[in-house]
Every structure is written in structure tokens, then in C-alpha cells.
């Protein structure tokens, strides 16, 4: 009996269209991989900038050299660049985040050996730093560490080419120890380089099986902004595979969206990576610290210590922080806070007996107080003519007659030396030609009466503060600049309010001068009022004054130690005795703001807008608040959903004015969002009456 013929079904051949689609998909995947690899170039250049400027506070020093710094990034960056002070401080903190987590592990695991696996290592020279016996930084780890660098095959090959052509690095690693095999393409006694695409979970699983750690060896995985570019399920698979290895730790540093994807910094950050064809894919699934903690516990790491980068900054030794602050002039605190709140440093382990020491454990983040707040104040984005003219930050403004606003000086890419006139519908406002104040930012511009405006202080750079003062005076239908008596000490990021009878009260700021000063326009002199000498001189506080009640209010601002204050102080000014009396001081988490603005909106109600906080990123319910001054009750003004999603304002370096009809305008300002680009504001209106488009022109 003959057997039945066996039918073998062959796979259908691809059509020409399917082949083209497949080839296109492969090309797209390769291009995406190259774009992700390209992020290494920018990152390593920024770290080289830090290495050159911050060498004395990096902790890498040649042994016995009396403090001579040891450099490693220089081998991987052919043309060094100098980044901005904010980017430098941010990358210094990133380097410190990884080093601090490794130090925590070393201190908490006795004398056990530690295998460090750097996932998506790029050109990171961490192994060379901590294997270099001529570097003081190595000594604290007592020769306990060995390293595995893991990255795309092309990137690992380029890194190894640099290593093999650099005698100093070869000397640190020592000679080859055994043949390389499988994904491991280079091996010495304390170092391995492995070529692996982390998107290939099977390949990564095979790689981890090749480590063969001893039962008493600690395995540490580092992912510094590497899993962030992967789809969340693939990144989770990596973390879960690492969690199956006994005695393992995972150090994660990547982006957060603490106020959601629509907040201005987050929106700018996401757009930057998307436009560079390296979109952040995991952050939308794990946008907050608490969600990252849940993630790690679900994937096998039950013991988690996580915080944002500002929590890390606050945990550092105060002497070290002081040294960092002294490296280069720095006046970008708002941008630094914004950066810090958008990055997490998480240290997770499956060793339930491991304890995070007191100097490493992050305190639990307090719950946002916004849940107890509510308001239905209407808001809308106002149409403006030539909106690009609003691109200026840290200027100062006044309202003159007919609700025309003068927005003076400030900064775009450079300091501006002009005035933006807003709302002058008939074009009648003019300033005559003649001597005028030079360009500046962080100054004050205060209306003393209908014919006199007082400008004082500011800065050109953090090391070039200004002490000059000017009056803008109306004579014969035209406005004229007149120089008046200068300050004894320069001052910027200060406050100035009109207290009546041609007098201006100047408070705080960066200065060696008095906490309070009075400028008397009639006599063209300054003098100190009588005030409690214990009252702090704060920088970038919010200050306003209400003539009807003869009450002034000072909120937030930075103290001498750069801690941001969380108090609202009520004071009275007595013009007869030229004295200031502190009437009341209250505290609230939402008062803790640096760079906020305030105005008394109506009897007994004060509006507080914007600024930044060390402990939270302000969102659609906390960016704008109103205080009932008789009860100190805080109400949060909810920014409408459509406005927040499409036009959320970055309330830094902005201006706030109240118009004759009670309408409040918030305008100008913005910030450079770390290395991701700038975000600029339009005009936001608070009030019940719709207003017409606002014309803008430059004087």
C-alpha cells in the first residue's frame, strides 16, 4: 500500500510592494537606532564641559599630586564646548547621581565585590575612572569593582577603537584576559565590552546569563537615559530580567513629566527629542516618581529609593554644594529647578535586607496641597499683534494712562535696550531722544505718579550688577529720561513699590546694601527706613503694596543660603516716621516660590502667579493662587483644560499688571528649557470681560 504524498506548504513569496515595505521598515529601525546613538554625542560633550570647569568638585584627582584633576572625557570629545551654567550644573548633578548611588551600594554591602553593568553606556568613562589606581576617586571603592559596558554594536566598536588607540586607557584596563566570545567583544581582568541591542530581549537575556556572578557578588545595572528611548514593554523586560539576578541593584536616571505632558518644560523636552528622531517612549507610561516606584516593585525590585534631582541636590554635603556654586557665575535658578523636577534618580534592589543610609534615603515627597483648592476664575489667552515681540524675559513693566503698558528692557538672546509698548492703540506714547538707560535685566520699573516712573538697578551679567537709577518723566506731552542719584550698592532681582508722596520702597535682591531703602523723588536721595533688623533680605521675592489698606506683602524668595522661603509677610509703612512694621507672617507650601509676582486684586484678596519651587513643579492648579488676606485661606485658580493643553505659560521672568477695570494681564517671560530649546509666553488674561487684541510696538 503506497503512502499518501506529503504536502509541504511553502511560505508565500513577498510581493514587490511587501518587500519595499519591509525594506522601509528596516531602514526606519536603523535610522531610529542611529538617532538614539546620536544622543551620546551631545551628552558626552556636555559632560566634557563639566569636566573642564568643575574638575575640582568632581572628586577625580591624581594621587599624590596635591589636587591635580584627572580627566577622562577628553579622550572621547575632540572639540570641547562650554555649555551654559545651568547645563553644566545639571550634568555635574547627573554625574554625582550615579557616583552617589554607587557609593551607597558600596557602603551597604560590606566588602563584597561589585559588578557594574552600564546599559547603553555610550562613551561614558565610568570604568576608567573607578579602575584607575592613580585616581583618588577609585580608593573609596577599595578595588571591589569590575565593569561591563553594553551598547549597540556600532557604538561599542567606536568606543573600543578609542580605547585601543589611547595608551592611558589601555594602561588602566590592563591586558586582554582570555578570548572574547558571543556578545562580549573585549575582555580584561576587570572590564568587558558587550555588543547588544537592548531592544532584543532574547539577546539581552543571553548576555546576562554569561555574567556568571558569584553568589556573594553584587550586580549593579545602570541605565542613564538609555531605557527612556525604548518602548515601555521592552524597557520593562530589561528591568525584569535584571531583577531575576540575586543581589542585584538597578540605578535609573531618566526623564519625568511631573505636571503632565502639557506643562511648558515637558512639552518642550518631548518636542526636542521627537524632532531629533529619538522620542522618549517610556516617560508617558511612568511620568512620576511614585509610578516609577510601582514599576520597579512590580518588576522584581521590591526595595526602592527614588527622588527627583533637586532632592539629590538638597541631600549633598553643604560644603560640596558651596564649592559647586562658586565654580562659575550662576543666575539661572529657575531653569535649574525646572530641570531637576524633570529627572528621576532611582536606586532599586531585590535585596530586601539592604538599607539605604540616612544620607542617601530620599524623604517621602509630601502630597500636593492643591487638592484642597478650587476656583472658577475665567482665563483666556489674549490675541496680540506681532506676538514675537513678547519674547523677552526678566524685564519690568508699568501701566501708564489709558491702560498702556511699558515693558522695559529684559533679555532675549542678549540684553535688550528698548521698551515694548503694549495697548497704545492710537500710537500716541513717545519718548524723546537723548541719554537713556543701558540694556539690563532683573531691574524694577515703578510708577510714582502719572508723570514719573522710577527705574533702578538690574544687571548686565551676574558679575556686572547695576546701581544706576533713572526717572522717566512726562513734560510738554513727551516723556524724557533723566538720570537720578545712583544706589550706593548695585542691586538686582529686587523689588520696588510706590508707597506714596513720591517715595519708592526698595526691598531685597542680590546686593551688599540694606534690606530696605526709600528713594525720595523730591530730594533725589536714598535712606534706610526703620525696620526690624532680623527681617531677611530675600532674592526674587514677590512684593506688592495696597494703598487703600496701607499694607504691603512680601512672599517667598531665596534666603542667604539660597533656601526658598515659604512665608507671606504683611507689613505697614508709616510715612511720618519712615518706619516699617511687620504685622503678620504666615506659611504655606504654595508660598514657597522663587521669582513669583503678586498683586492685590480686590479688597482682601491677593493674586500670586508663577515662579518656581524647590519641592514641586507647579501645574494647572498650583501655578496661580489667590489668598484671602483676612483668613489666609489659599484658593487655587484652575487653568482651563483647553488653555493648559494648548497654551500653558512658562511663568518665569514674566510680568503681571492689573488694569483700570480690574482685569489682570500676565505676559512676557519664558525660559530656556535646559538643552531642549526655549519656551516663550503670550498674554494671559484673568477677568470676566473679553478684551480686544493688544497692539505691540518697540520704542
Swiss-Prot record:
Pathway(s) where this gene product acts: tRNA modification; wybutosine-tRNA(Phe) biosynthesis
EC number(s) given by UniProt: 2.1.1.290, 2.3.1.231
Keywords for the protein's UniProt record, in alphabetical order: Methyltransferase, S-adenosyl-L-methionine, Transferase, tRNA processing
Superkingdom classification of source: Eukaryota
Keyword Transferase included in the entry's annotation: yes
One GO BP: wybutosine biosynthetic process
Top enzyme class: transferase
Catalytic function, reaction form: 7-[(3S)-3-amino-3-carboxypropyl]wyosine(37) in tRNA(Phe) + S-adenosyl-L-methionine = 7-[(3S)-(3-amino-3-methoxycarbonyl)propyl]wyosine(37) in tRNA(Phe) + S-adenosyl-L-homocysteine; 7-[(3S)-(3-amino-3-methoxycarbonyl)propyl]wyosine(37) in tRNA(Phe) + S-adenosyl-L-methionine + CO2 = wybutosine(37) in tRNA(Phe) + S-adenosyl-L-homocysteine + 2 H(+)
Similarity comment: Belongs to the methyltransferase superfamily. LCMT family.
Protein's job: Probable S-adenosyl-L-methionine-dependent methyltransferase that acts as a component of the wybutosine biosynthesis pathway. Wybutosine is a hyper modified guanosine with a tricyclic base found at the 3'-position adjacent to the anticodon of eukaryotic phenylalanine tRNA. May methylate the carboxyl group of leucine residues to form alpha-leucine ester residues.
Annotated protein name in UniProt: tRNA wybutosine-synthesizing protein 4
Species for this entry: Eremothecium gossypii (strain ATCC 10895 / CBS 109.51 / FGSC 9923 / NRRL Y-1056) (Yeast)
Amino acid at each position: 500500500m503506497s503512502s499518501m504524498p506529503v504536502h509541504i506548504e511553502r511560505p508565500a513569496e513577498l510581493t514587490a510592494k511587501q518587500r519595499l515595505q519591509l525594506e522601509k521598515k528596516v531602514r526606519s529601525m536603523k535610522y531610529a537606532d542611529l538617532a538614539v546613538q546620536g544622543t551620546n554625542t551631545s551628552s558626552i560633550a556636555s559632560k566634557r564641559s563639566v569636566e573642564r570647569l568643575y574638575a575640582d568638585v568632581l572628586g577625580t584627582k591624581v594621587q599624590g599630586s596635591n589636587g591635580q584633576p584627572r580627566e577622562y572625557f577628553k579622550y572621547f570629545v575632540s572639540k570641547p564646548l562650554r555649555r551654559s551654567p545651568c547645563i553644566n550644573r545639571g550634568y555635574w548633578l547627573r554625574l554625582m547621581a550615579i557616583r552617589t548611588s554607587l557609593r551607597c551600594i558600596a557602603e551597604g554591602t560590606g566588602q563584597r565585590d561589585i559588578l557594574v553593568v552600564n546599559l547603553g553606556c555610550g562613551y561614558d568613562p565610568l570604568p576608567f575612572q573607578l579602575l584607575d589606581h592613580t585616581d583618588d576617586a577609585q580608593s573609596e571603592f577599595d578595588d571591589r569593582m569590575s565593569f561591563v559596558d553594553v551598547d549597540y554594536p556600532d557604538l561599542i566598536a567606536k568606543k573600543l577603537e578609542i580605547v585601543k588607540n589611547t595608551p592611558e586607557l589601555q594602561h588602566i584596563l590592563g591586558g586582554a584576559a582570555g578570548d572574547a566570545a558571543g556578545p562580549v567583544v573585549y575582555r580584561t581582568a576587570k572590564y568587558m565590552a558587550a555588543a547588544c541591542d537592548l531592544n532584543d530581549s532574547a539577546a539581552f537575556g543571553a548576555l546576562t546569563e554569561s555574567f556568571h556572578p558569584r553568589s556573594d557578588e553584587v550586580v549593579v545595572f545602570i541605565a542613564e537615559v538609555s531605557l527612556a528611548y525604548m518602548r515601555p514593554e521592552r524597557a520593562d523586560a530589561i528591568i525584569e530580567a535584571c531583577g531575576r539576578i540575586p543581589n542585584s541593584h538597578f540605578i535609573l536616571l531618566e526623564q519625568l513629566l511631573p505636571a503632565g505632558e502639557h506643562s511648558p518644560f515637558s512639552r518642550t523636552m518631548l518636542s526636542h527629542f521627537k524632532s531629533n528622531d529619538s522620542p522618549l517612549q517610556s516617560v508617558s507610561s511612568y511620568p512620576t516618581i511614585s509610578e516609577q516606584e510601582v514599576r520597579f516593585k512590580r518588576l522584581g525590585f521590591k526595595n526602592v529609593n527614588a527622588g527627583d534631582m533637586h532632592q539629590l541636590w538638597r541631600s549633598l554635603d553643604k560644603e560640596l554644594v558651596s564649592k559647586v556654586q562658586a565654580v562659575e557665575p550662576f543666575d539661572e535658578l529657575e531653569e535649574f529647578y525646572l530641570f531637576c523636577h524633570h529627572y528621576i534618580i532611582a536606586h532599586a534592589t531585590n535585596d530586601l535586607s539592604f538599607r539605604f543610609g540616612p544620607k542617601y534615603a530620599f524623604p517621602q515627597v509630601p502630597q500636593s496641597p492643591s487638592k484642597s483648592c478650587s476656583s472658577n476664575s475665567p482665563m483666556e489667552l489674549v490675541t496680540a499683534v506681532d506676538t514675537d515681540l513678547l519674547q523677552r524675559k526678566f524685564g519690568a513693566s508699568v501701566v501708564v494712562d489709558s491702560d498702556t503698558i511699558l515693558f522695559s528692557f529684559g533679555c532675549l538672546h542678549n540684553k535688550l535696550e528698548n521698551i515694548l509698548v503694549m495697548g497704545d492703540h492710537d500710537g500716541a506714547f513717545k519718548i524723546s531722544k537723548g541719554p537713556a538707560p543701558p540694556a539690563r535685566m532683573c531691574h524694577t520699573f515703578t510708577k510714582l505718579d502719572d508723570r514719573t516712573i522710577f527705574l533702578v538697578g538690574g544687571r548686565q551679567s551676574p558679575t556686572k550688577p547695576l546701581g544706576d537709577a533713572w526717572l522717566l518723566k512726562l513734560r510738554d506731552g513727551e516723556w524724557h529720561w533723566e538720570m537720578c542719584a545712583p544706589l550706593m550698592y548695585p542691586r538686582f532681582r529686587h523689588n520696588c513699590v510706590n508707597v506714596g508722596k513720591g517715595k519708592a520702597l526698595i526691598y531685597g535682591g542680590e546686593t551688599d546694601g540694606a534690606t530696605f531703602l526709600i528713594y525720595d523723588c523730591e530730594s533725589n536721595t536714598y535712606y534706610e527706613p526703620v525696620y526690624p533688623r532680623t527681617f531677611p533680605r530675600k532674592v526674587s521675592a514677590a512684593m506688592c503694596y495696597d494703598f487703600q489698606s496701607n499694607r504691603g506683602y512680601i512672599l517667598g524668595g531665596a534666603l542667604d543660603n539660597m533656601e526658598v522661603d515659604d512665608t507671606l509677610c504683611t507689613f505697614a509703612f508709616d510715612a511720618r516716621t519712615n518706619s516699617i512694621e511687620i504685622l503678620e507672617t504666615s506659611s504655606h507650601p504654595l508660598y514657597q516660590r522663587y521669582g513669583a509676582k503678586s498683586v492685590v486684586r480686590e479688597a482682601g484678596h491677593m493674586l500670586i502667579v508663577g515662579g518656581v519651587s524647590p519641592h514641586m513643579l507647579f501645574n494647572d492648579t498650583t501655578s496661580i493662587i489667590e489668598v484671602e488676606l483676612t483668613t489666609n485661606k489659599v484658593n487655587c485658580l484652575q487653568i482651563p483644560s483647553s488653555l493648559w493643553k494648548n497654551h500653558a505659560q512658562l511663568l518665569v521672568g514674566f510680568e503681571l499688571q492689573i488694569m483700570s477695570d480690574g482685569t489682570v494681564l500676565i505676559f512676557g517671560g519664558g525660559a530656556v528649557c535646559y538643552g531642549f530649546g526655549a519656551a516663550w509666553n503670550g498674554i494671559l488674561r484673568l477677568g470676566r470681560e473679553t478684551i480686544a487684541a493688544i497692539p505691540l510696538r518697540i520704542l
